[in-house]
Design a protein with these regions (language model features):
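Secreted/periplasmic carbohydrate-active enzymes, especially glycoside hydrolases
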Residues: 1-76, 80-81, 136-137, 153-159
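Substrate-binding/catalytic cleft of secreted carbohydrate-active enzymes
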Residues: 61-179
Length: 179
């Protein structure tokens, strides 16, 4: 159906690929807010309209930020040909930002209960969305919100679904892991 991968070019620069061809992911961050329903779209047509407009404006992907949409949204992305970077919605503690420091070794610490909830919810999201080919990149942490044990989360995500790329914390603290 589709293959998402990465490959170094002749200059050593990592390029994202779709079906073994370089494919620059270009798209907006979409929080999925609706003026008359906050997180719930008023109609299926409204879901479709937003995705189609994104494509019409020249984008080829959407970073789904802070929420998981209903199944119809992903079905529309599949049909229209929009890739999705799916974030894990915010969780636990406020972000701890490591400004201009790509890895200090410091990360948030969660309670055992919070860790278990995170892991269950992330697995449930991945299971729910697994069959949608539009999902190209899993993002275990939205920015730095609740970011903890980043390398373990990225490795688990990659092992659980090796058919997709992993961006450990899109817009968050960089760690030496993921794709």
């Amino acid at each position: 159906m589709r293959k998402v991968s990465k490959q170094r070019d002749r200059n050593g620069i990592v390029r994202l690929q779709l079906n073994n061809k370089n494919y620059f992911h270009f798209g907006p961050l979409d929080q999925g807010w609706w003026p008359d329903g906050l997180y719930t779209a008023p109609t299926d047509e409204a879901l479709l309209y937003d995705i189609q407009k994104t494509k019409d404006w020249g984008y080829n992907m959407i970073r789904k930020h802070v929420k998981v949409e209903p199944a119809r949204w992903y079905t529309h992305c599949d049909r229209i040909g929009i890739l999705v970077w799916q974030d894990m919605p915010n969780g636990d503690k406020s972000p701890h930002w490591d400004m201009r420091n790509y890895f200090s070794g410091n990360e948030n610490v969660r309670s055992a209960e919070s860790e278990a909830i995170y892991r269950k919810e992330w697995k449930d999201i991945m299971d729910f969305l697994y069959s949608y080919p539009s999902i190209a990149v899993w993002v275990p942490f939205n920015e730095a919100w609740g970011q903890f044990e980043t390398e373990k989360a990225a490795e688990w995500t990659k092992t659980y679904d090796p058919s997709r790329l992993v961006n450990p914390a899109s817009g968050g603290n960089h760690r030496p892991c993921g794709d």
